[in-house]
Regions:
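FKBP-type peptidyl-prolyl cis-trans isomerase
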Residues: 44-54, 136-151, 224-234, 404-423, ...
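Aromatic/histidine-rich interaction motifs
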Residues: 52-128, 244-399
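Extracellular/periplasmic catalytic domains that process cell-envelope and extracellular macromolecules
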Residues: 35-37, 105, 116, 136-137, ...
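Conserved, compact domain cores that house catalytic/ligand-binding motifs in diverse enzymes
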Residues: 20-21, 172-218, 458-504
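Extracytoplasmic
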Residues: 372, 376-388, 420-670
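Acidic/polar, low-complexity intrinsically disordered N-terminal segments immediately downstream
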Residues: 1-104, 118-120, 131, 152-193, ...
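Internal, charge-rich low-complexity segments
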Residues: 177-196, 233-261, 541-571
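Non-catalytic, alpha-helical, charged scaffold/linker segments
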Residues: 193-217, 237-240, 247-250, 270-278, ...
Length: 670
């Protein structure tokens, strides 16, 4: 704060910092007090010219006294990032290419960064050029910008509709009613904050760590949107012709092609929920055009670097447990998400470890996956433009038409794709051709909207997540990330994070959809230790109607407790011996942890497969069930011990087609 006070060109932002408080409490500190205290802060301070130009634009005067309290907060809070325990951002740490800073600002918005094509200066949020950088102070870095940082207040749908190269998707969002579903729902957010206002700022003590109470539940979305050229080139749509008011004058010709193509890709007389298809009303969720659009939409607003979580994948050296480096990636990393609507689809996002680390939708790959392999990608199924939804490149910003359009909305993000994405039978078949390993965080989409995954630890009230229901009153839900808890390092979790549920827990978890009808083996992965619990698992197609599957599972066991002692450290054994040991372990309902991820802090070299037999990482085979797309399935977990301080560990699941389980070639160890 001293630097700002000493610079007369920053007097306006200094004045606002002295007026604006951090938080709604009556005793909340002003930003000037916050910035004068210890911490790690990144400040993009607008100079006086920038502040006055912004105030003039808002209120027709340069007088700061004309600003409302909301306007003052908008200016002041948007330019500050609280980096917490991590280092503040100097310019060498800035993301480029339209990617966003990994930590949100004080308005819970992720800020993008590009470089000016002329002088290579950094540009924040599309128009705030850094005219001075890297003023290092005792508690962070200050950068001076020439515009006030003011992220869009439009919804995701509104930004799509404003993009001049997405007129077709913008119109389809409106006609199908999905634009209304993507609207800003601040009333829900405010209701949650009001209900839990007395818990704001409080913590719960658990596993020797103070867990902050999750005081917000933001409602946000992610959309993948075709540019107009995708429909023109892939489906033969006419190019949109637009009048002076922005209306598409040849819409009927475009709609005719869209409707025809959607019928081709969804030819069934019933949708996945066995509802008769409505061919006339696009707002009916069984309508083929509605289903086409819905497959592009996700609950949870994610900046592009939040699609996957890098932490302990094979051969990746994260360097820092509390802030893994965003470089040196080694293997493909992916996650799965359920799309919106009653006809939930399964959408896979993969990041490659090469080049600029691009992201792809529904990339189906083959790997060097032998026992002595490296898991490097060998090949990927090629894109068939307009015919499938396979292997589509995601663009981080919308600049595909020579003009940059804002894709960072108040309630989420949209990302351009250059080919039409369809969830037809070929796409589903390819998705169902591989083992689906799904992290628990992606099942609980509210986490995606809180800028929490991999960055924060938290305690959640037991009614927080839509996909966790029928929760007993004594159940407590915690989210943990290695590096952020007091007990850090040497974890054996997939992606380095986990949920722990304690108390006399009893809850039901909604599972992701399967892409094709068929029989699937369902597995649950966990890192075991003597603080865990024992529980009964139930399966069913209704949260209120589940049946027990198998015997109770004990997450406290060591490998010596498995009947017949089939677990063997096979790191020096022959391939034949390894396969035999794996079969013996499967016969008891267990599998070793995948070779794909490693013990935290081992620089990606010590895989969890053979680590610490007294507290192993294992997969339990829960059940094999016939499952259909369009139907919802649930697992219930009920504590089987009296102790209320024991932990149920929720990490990841695998859904494996029986064609892989029963194949002649044994399943890979990855």
């Amino acid at each position: 704060m001293d630097y700002i006070s000493d610079d007369p060109n920053l007097s306006d932002i200094k004045s606002l910092f002295e007026q604006v408080k951090l938080g709604k409490a009556s005793n909340a500190s002003t930003l000037s007090s916050v910035l004068a205290a210890r911490g790690n802060y990144t400040v993009f301070a607008p100079n006086n010219d920038a502040v006055r130009a912004y105030v003039q634009q808002l209120n027709g005067t340069t007088d700061l006294s004309s600003l409302t309290e909301e306007q003052k907060q908008q200016i002041a809070l948007n330019c500050i990032i609280d980096n917490g325990t991590s280092n503040a951002y100097e310019s060498a740490d800035f993301p480029i290419g339209g990617n966003t800073f990994s930590t949100s600002n004080l308005r819970d918005r992720r800020l993008s960064c590009t470089q000016d094509s002329v002088d290579q200066a950094f540009v924040i949020n599309g128009d705030a050029k850094c005219i001075e950088t890297n003023h290092e102070v005792s508690n962070g870095y200050l950068h001076v910008v020439d515009h006030v940082i003011s992220p869009s207040t439009n919804s995701v749908a509104e930004l799509v509709q404003k993009a001049g190269n997405m007129r077709i998707m913008g119109r389809l969002l409106a006609l199908t009613g999905w634009a209304d579903s993507l609207s800003v729902k601040t009333s829900q957010e405010e209701a949650y904050e009001t209900e839990h206002i007395n818990d704001a700022g409080s913590t719960k003590r658990f596993v020797n760590t103070n867990f902050p109470y999750m005081e917000k539940r933001s409602v946000a979305y992610t959309a993948f949107m075709e540019v107009d050229d995708a429909f023109i080139n892939d489906w033969g749509c006419p190019a949109p012709e637009v009048d002076g008011e922005g209306n598409i004058t040849n819409w009927q010709a475009i709609e005719d092609v869209i409707v025809s193509k959607c019928k081709e890709n969804f030819p069934e007389s019933e949708d996945d929920t066995h509802t008769a298809v409505d061919l006339t009303n696009m707002k009916a969720t069984s309508n083929p055009v509605n289903r086409f659009v819905a497959y592009h939409l996700l609950y949870g607003g994610m900046a592009i670097d939040e699609f996957v979580h890098h932490f302990n994948e094979y051969n990746y050296d994260m360097v820092n447990l509390d802030a893994p480096v965003a470089r040196g990636y080694s293997v493909n990393v992916w996650d799965y998400y359920a799309t919106m609507g009653p006809n939930r689809g399964l959408l896979k996002v993969t990041q490659l470890p090469t080049g600029d680390y691009p992201f792809y939708l529904n990339r189906i790959s083959t790997y060097d996956d032998g026992i002595k392999g490296t898991y490097e990608e060998r090949s990927a199924v090629e894109t068939k433009p307009g015919q499938t939804g396979i292997n589509l490149l995601i663009h981080p910003i919308n600049d595909l038409s020579g003009v940059t359009y804002d894709n960072n909305a108040l309630n989420g993000f949209y990302y351009p794709i250059e080919h039409v994405m369809v969830y037809n039978d070929e796409t589903r078949t390819l998705l169902a051709s591989e083992r689906m390993r799904i992290d628990a965080t992606t099942l609980l989409y509210e986490l995606q909207s809180q800028d929490c995954r991999g960055k924060k630890i938290a305690y959640f009230p037991n009614d927080y997540f839509a996909n966790i229901s029928n929760v007993s009153t004594s159940t407590e839900i915690y989210y943990l990330q290695d590096g952020l808890c007091d007990n850090k390092g040497s974890w054996k979790d997939f992606q380095g994070d986990e949920f722990l549920l304690t108390g006399r827990f009893d809850f039901v978890l909604k599972l992701p959809p399967v892409p094709k009808a068929g029989s699937y083996e369902i597995r649950m992965g966990a890192s075991l230790n003597d603080q865990r619990s024992m529980f009964q698992v139930y399966f069913g197609d209704s949260p209120d109607r589940t049946s027990p599957i198998g015997l109770p599972i004990d997450q406290r066991e060591s490998v010596s407790m498995i009947p017949g002692s089939p677990w063997v450290d096979d790191s020096g054994l022959s391939e034949a011996s390894i396969r035999e040991n794996d079969r013996n372990l499967r016969n008891q309902g267990y599998m070793k942890s995948p070779n794909y991820f490693t013990v935290d802090g081992s620089k990606g070299l010590t895989t969890t497969r053979n680590a610490t037999p007294n507290s192993p990482a294992l997969r339990r085979i829960l059940t094999t069930q016939y499952m259909e797309p369009g139907k919802s399935y649930y697992l219930r977990f009920k504590s089987a011990v009296e102790a209320s301080n024991k932990q149920f560990m929720l990490d990841y699941f695998e859904f494996v087609p029986v064609s892989i389980v029963n194949a002649v070639e044994p399943e890979d160890i990855w």
